[in-house]
Amino acid sequence: MAVKVITDSTSCIPKDLAEKYGVEIVSLSVIMNGESYKEVDIDSEAFYDELAKCDKLPTSSQPPMDEFYNAFEKFAKDGHDIVAAFISSKLSGTYTTSHIIKDMILEKYPDVKIDLIDSQTSVMALGIGVLEGAKAAQEGKDFNEVSKIVRNTIEESEIIFVPGTLENLKKGGRIGGAAALFGKMLKINPILTVKEGAVVVMDKVRTKKRAIDKIVEVVKQDLKEKGIKQAVVCHILAEDEAKDLAKRLKEELDLDSMIGEISAVIGVHVGVKSVGIAYARES
């Protein structure tokens, strides 16, 4: 039987690519003003307009257990093995819950092989690894090969971005209030990345232009030292800036990139006008 790949909605894989490569996506939800919104159904402009009116930062919730279980069972019942990669366990409980689902599935379908992966990252740094694995599965690679490709690609993945605001990071406890106020007063633009599963500050610069320059510099270094096999410019309602960055990467580095939106679960923390890049180095 074939190998199937499952991930969650924070991977930011576009619907057309998920369908093309047979990726099953389970959706996290964002809870705002007492209402729950499935991430895959969110209209970005309406969502962030509403977010701007909130005093309290929205929270996120894992996929419902029945939907989570059904995503696995639809493959297991046909005898397919499963490789599943999820958002960092330090950012969500989704990966932890997937172990409960795995145990339930194996009790009913003991011959199915399931590999669960804590990506230690999110957004398209996760999505790129999932897509590489799904492509390999479609090419007929076996369970161990697909698992290795997903793991290795994620391990070589990077996400670097400039948040649109420090306020949401402060509200969510990602940075301290004093740090947020200090950054706002001095117009400091932090450059963020994900290390060991958590969002951390890579660098701090005085303007967003310098932040973008720094991102290009980091990408250029990785391209020179290891090569880059896939890149996605990510943004939140900053399509023009994203296109400018993608154009710059092509003109200066001859690096092609897709353009995609940052997931709402992550977006509530980093805010509108966030822009950055996710990419996977050659392994």
UniProtKB/Swiss-Prot annotation:
Signal peptide per UniProt: none
Domain DegV: 3-281
Database matches in InterPro entries: DegV, DegV_C, DegV_domain_contain
Binding, hexadecanoate: 60, 92
Source species, domain of life: Bacteria
Keywords carried by this UniProt record: Lipid-binding
A GO molecular-function descriptor: lipid binding
PANTHER family, A to Z: DEGV DOMAIN-CONTAINING PROTEIN DR_1986-RELATED, FATTY ACID-BINDING PROTEIN TM_1468
Function text: May bind long-chain fatty acids, such as palmitate, and may play a role in lipid transport or fatty acid metabolism.
Protein name: DegV domain-containing protein CPE0304
Species, as recorded: Clostridium perfringens (strain 13 / Type A)
